[in-house]
Design a protein with these regions (language model features):
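Surface-exposed binding patches on compact interaction domains or structured appendages
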Residues: 4-21, 45-121
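Short, solvent-exposed loop/turn segments enriched in Ser/Thr/Gly
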Residues: 21, 32-38, 128-138
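Contiguous beta-strand segments within globular domains
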Residues: 22-45, 209
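Short solvent-exposed strand-capping/beta-turn motif centered on an Asx-Ser/Thr pair
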Residues: 32, 42-48, 126-128, 142-144
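Aromatic-lined carbohydrate-binding surfaces of glycoside hydrolases
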Residues: 90, 94, 123-125, 136-141, ...
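Catalytic domains of carbohydrate-active enzymes that cleave complex glycans
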Residues: 276, 294-302, 306-337, 348-362, ...
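Aromatic- and acid-rich polysaccharide-binding/catalytic face
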Residues: 288-289, 359-383, 395-397
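Catalytic-core region of carbohydrate-active enzymes that cleave or remodel glycosidic bonds
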Residues: 375-457
């Protein structure tokens, strides 16, 4: 039997040989972070068997044992890998099975003669403080005899600081209701939602989308997504009253999960504010929709409703102690043609919310120049225009259209996911957004999809764009390799911040930042020009760790 240990950035495909540049026998980590590596295995080339059942045993030192998780790597089909412009970047541009799902170790493990399989091992000490030293993890597979491989981890005497920026991956609880067949606001809804929220926070997603009304996102005009509405609305003519019991429950759940920032869902429809989101209300004892696609988003009826809601909502958020950690949306991804409508709605919202707490995904800098937004969330392919204009508060985002920037598509090299942390640090980006933590719908939410059967939203987007967790048994999330790597990117950013804090003891913060960029050879790196080679990124992180402890 063959066994190879590899970095977390390797891809163990069932129909490809291993890339030796990812082979890794040892690594180093800080005392309070997560460190992952992989072990791949297959039968010897001269083995006469096609496949055989094997035993798997991992010997873990006592110091690491409470924090070490071993998962079997499973595969998800991808029928739409990348756009033609980025196919050359991929080591598997064809449709096929892609390693992503991290399952519990099965009762029976199979080894094959013609296919590599693997396990993913994580020492997850982010809520601990490991004792510095060198530890050896021994991986054993038993066939007719036992085959072993060792991996050494050196824990260095240094720690990561707390994550400094808000990070959101949009959190779609209607998709959880659909998959698990539970009703909104049921006991099961809250249990499952909290499980997924805890997973989000654990992996660096410290801001959660808060559905005050059903988020008007990725919904066909005239269509509806399942109602998820935290505010109860009571209508009496043109007067409204509100109940915040569900909202309070949401905030308590978020606090238990460790959420730090709250992203109030969009108050106007996507792509330009033309309509109101779906709002359900009780009127004369009947629960019904009162606003939606047939409602002018900046007409007097809907704005009059918001004039009554927003003061009460803000008072409630202040009572809950979270208003200063709340961010508000107008409309997602408005274009220049929609600027007039966006202007009306943005100016309206600014009567109630400070401009620095209003943020939207957009890439047209004229919205900023004309004073319509102070906190733009910019597509990574457009960020440098905003940097050149010296915009003080820039967030970044990527989605299906960003294949030549950092992204997490299944068919892109894992390094293209991992390098994000270096870029966020170098360019002082204040926050990061991605649209799909767990979006299990098709294009425009016309259908529900099974994420285990389709990674592409039913063929709509490149595989991996719409979600980074899978719905597991008993309402628990199943983590993806891509989410593990995304967390590593955020840890890289935090390690650089720790190094900057160290250097700042002897020089200004600005000079320390410049010194680090130069010392690491990152002067030429931009959001569009980068080295995402996995071996390079692993070695670069080790260099950062050594600089921290020298």
């Amino acid at each position: 039997m063959k066994i190879e240990t590899l970095s977390s950035l390797a891809k163990i495909y069932p129909d490809r040989d291993l890339d030796s540049k990812y082979f890794q026998k040892e690594g180093c980590m800080l005392q309070n972070e997560a460190f992952s590596f992989q072990a791949a295995f297959k039968l010897d080339d001269n083995d006469t068997q096609i496949k055989t059942a094997i035993g798997c045993k991992i010997d873990i030192p006592d110091e690491l044992k409470p924090y070490t998780r071993v998962k079997a790597i499973d595969y998800v089909p991808c029928d739409y890998t990348l756009y033609p412009s980025s196919l050359a970047l991929s080591d598997h541009p064809e449709p096929g099975l892609f390693p992503d799902i991290l399952r519990d170790i099965p009762t029976i493990f199979w080894a094959y003669s013609n296919s590599w399989r693997g396990i993913f091992i994580t020492v997850d000490a982010q809520n601990a403080l490991l004792t510095p030293g060198t530890y050896t993890i021994k991986i054993s597979f038993k066939q007719s005899r036992t085959y072993t491989k060792e991996f050494r981890i050196e824990v260095l005497e240094a720690t990561l600081p707390k994550q400094s920026i808000p990070v959101t991956n949009w959190f779609h609880t209607d998709c959880l209701c659909n998959y698990y067949n539970v009703e909104f606001n049921s006991a099961e809804y809250w249990r499952i939602t909290e499980n997924f929220a805890k997973a989000a926070v654990h992996y660096g997603v410290n801001m959660l989308l808060m559905p005050v009304f059903t988020p008007p996102l990725d919904t066909a005009v005239g269509g509806e997504r399942r109602t998820i509405q935290l505010i109860d609305v009571y209508k009496d003519g043109d007067k409204y009253s509100f109940g915040f019991k569900k909202l309070r429950k949401w905030v308590k759940m978020c606090k238990r999960a460790g959420v730090e920032y709250y992203e109030v869902s969009h108050l106007f429809t996507q792509w330009g504010c033309k309509y109101a989101p779906k709002v359900m209300a009780t009127e004369n004892g009947e629960y019904k929709r009162i606003f939606g696609w047939d409602t002018n988003g900046h007409g007097s009826e809907y704005l009059g409703f918001l004039e009554q809601l927003l003061p009460e909502l803000i008072t409630e958020l202040k009572k809950l102690g979270i208003f200063k950690k709340c961010y508000f949306h107008v409309s997602d991804e408005p274009t220049a043609e929609m600027k007039g409508d966006y202007s009306i709605c943005a100016k309206f919202l600014r009567q109630y919310v400070s401009p620095d707490r209003i943020f939207d995904a957009l890439s047209d800098i004229s919205f900023y120049k004309e004073g319509l937004i102070s906190c733009p969330v910019v597509g990574l392919d457009h960020v440098h225009r905003f940097i050149e204009e010296k915009v003080p508060t820039i967030w970044g985002y990527y989605c299906c259209g960003h294949d030549m920037t950092s992204n997490r598509f299944l068919a892109l090299p894992a390094g293209q996911n991992r390098m994000l942390g270096l870029q966020l640090y170098k360019f002082n980006i204040k926050g990061f957004l991605q649209w799909g933590f767990n979006f299990y719908n098709s294009h425009m939410s016309l259908e529900q999809i099974d994420p285990y059967g389709s990674s592409t939203g039913g063929g709509w987007v490149p595989g991996g764009d719409a979600f980074v967790v899978y719905p597991g048994a008993d309402g628990n999330p199943v983590i993806s390799i891509r989410l593990e790597v995304f967390r590593e990117a955020l840890q890289d950013m935090r390690a650089l911040e720790a190094l900057e804090a160290k250097y700042s003891a002897k020089m200004s913060k600005k000079k320390a930042h410049k010194e680090i960029i130069s010392k690491l050879g990152l002067d030429e790196m931009t959001f569009l020009k980068f080295n995402c080679d996995g071996k390079y990124l692993v070695e670069l992180r080790e260099k950062i760790n050594r600089l921290l402890t020298e």
